[in-house]
């Protein structure tokens, strides 16, 4: 079953109100994404994994992935496309603060548009379901960098620049090898398999009762 972005938003809010907090959803989303990635790649021990994160909850999922991948002994670099004080949500802030206590994960911040990495894998946690208007810097340069880099590319929830509701794209967008979205498939995502690559919808523990009156 495919659902709309608004339905997903309402299901998340209802689940949160039931006591299944959004930070639990974020934790389970990041963990499920890493499980899929590790299953695909096999051993990620010592692999250079670069995670681009935006300032919202899509970035927060990427922050959770960073912690889990460090547990697999990957060499993880997180590139936050902005300043930590501008992280938008409590859940993402909470996960950033954990990474700040983890020397095993390299943290980079700021609005740079000059990326000099040699990754084996890139995780796109830049933009999620809240896409609107033209994509600006530093996000645009990060997306360009992802597309120009020869490595395995993994999108969290949706490739950045793809509207998960309509399947339409912004002025710039990522092209990935695998996309893992959460709870249920959003209507627009499967329309662009050329951007998503392999596509999975993973359960993240939201109670089925959270769907009542919405689906």
Swiss-Prot record:
Superkingdom per UniProt: Archaea
Q: What is the annotated role of this protein in its UniProt record?
A: Catalyzes the epimerization of the S- and R-forms of NAD(P)HX, a damaged form of NAD(P)H that is a result of enzymatic or heat-dependent hydration. This is a prerequisite for the S-specific NAD(P)H-hydrate dehydratase to allow the repair of both epimers of NAD(P)HX.
- What is this enzyme's EC? 5.1.99.6
**Which InterPro entries does this UniProt record tie to the protein?**
YjeF_N_dom (IPR004443), YjeF_N_dom_sf (IPR036652), YJEFN_prot_NAXE-like (IPR032976)
Q: What is the cofactor note?
A: Binds 1 potassium ion per subunit.
Query: Which family, according to the similarity comment?
Result: Belongs to the NnrE/AIBP family.
Chain positions recorded as K(+) binding sites? 58, 124, 160
The molecular function terms in GO held by this entry are:
metal ion binding; NAD(P)HX epimerase activity; nucleotide binding
In what residue span(s) does the YjeF N-terminal domain sit? Answer: 8-212
- Which reactions appear under catalytic activity for this entry? (6R)-NADHX = (6S)-NADHX; (6R)-NADPHX = (6S)-NADPHX
Name used for this protein in its record: NAD(P)H-hydrate epimerase
Pfam families attached to this UniProt entry: YjeF_N (PF03853)
Question: For binding (6S)-NADPHX, which residues are annotated in this chain's numbering?
Answer: 57-61, 128-134, 139, 157
Q: Kindly report, in one word, the top-level EC class recorded for this enzyme.
A: isomerase
